Amino acid sequence: MNDTGRRILLNCDMGESFGAWRMGDDVHSMPLVDQANLACGFHAGDPLTMRRAVELAVRHGVSIGAHPAYPDLSGFGRRSLACSAEEVHAMVLYQIGALDAFCRSLGTQVAYVKPHGALYNDLVGDDELLRAVLDACAAYRKGLPLMVLALADNGRELELADEADVPLLFEAFADRAYLPDGRLAPRRLGGAVHHDPQRIIEQALAIARGEAFPDYDGNPLRLTADSLCVHGDNPQSLAVLRRLRAALDSL
């Protein structure tokens, strides 16, 4: 349980294969999560991959999130691009609609939006970009939630979301190191991504219980989150997901 008394959810980025290139183990990971963030074609995912990922989520009763990104297939969406707010609004709306077409064809719908990679990180501290993404969510469907990074202080995000009339979901990461303000440690830093399964489990359980855990510098950090993410592109992702699912279910 998080400090609101609600059960914390478990999410994973999926549907990230592209053509002959394979990423992650969606078939075995999907039954272990509550929410699946599905790539929409800009950083990964092609139409067939998207359809299959939606089918898999529907089969296992998993909530589907659109995972829009900058148009950056070669960089897997992890490079910031010099896009205007108008461009970001359009590309996010485009990607939500693409994934939702597959959802609707299978009797479901996109339940939330979680930006990917560099776009996700760029929203932190950039009000113009955050407004563009919030407005895209609001334009697509009233009440469509946006998943954002849980920070030590999310006051600004809450203020802008309230102006746009968009619900927020706050996300924390089990397998990433954090800076003191709650931002993710950049991947270029050594130790920014946790690979030790025990450390991942310990950090996840601390967040789920509303307890402090060590930030990148070893100082205590406390975050309030609705959902925990484990990345599907780590070598030990499936084994960690299984252990984490069991640990969260025991709380």
Curated annotation (Swiss-Prot):
GO biological process assignments: carbohydrate metabolic process
GO molecular function: 5-oxoprolinase (ATP-hydrolyzing) activity; ATP binding
Catalysis performed (reactions): 5-oxo-L-proline + ATP + 2 H2O = L-glutamate + ADP + phosphate + H(+)
Keyword Oxidoreductase appears in the UniProt entry: no
Annotated keywords: ATP-binding, Hydrolase, Nucleotide-binding
The protein's Enzyme Commission number: 3.5.2.9
InterPro entries associated with the record: Glyco_hydro/deAcase_b/a-brl, LamB/YcsF/PxpA-like
NCBIfam families, sorted: PRK05406.1-3, PRK05406.1-5
Quaternary structure and interacting proteins, as annotated: Forms a complex composed of PxpA, PxpB and PxpC.
Stored PANTHER family: 5-OXOPROLINASE SUBUNIT A, UNCHARACTERIZED PROTEIN YBGL-RELATED
Function: Catalyzes the cleavage of 5-oxoproline to form L-glutamate coupled to the hydrolysis of ATP to ADP and inorganic phosphate.
Family affiliation: Belongs to the LamB/PxpA family.
Protein name stated in the entry: 5-oxoprolinase subunit A 3
Gene symbol of the encoding locus: pxpA3
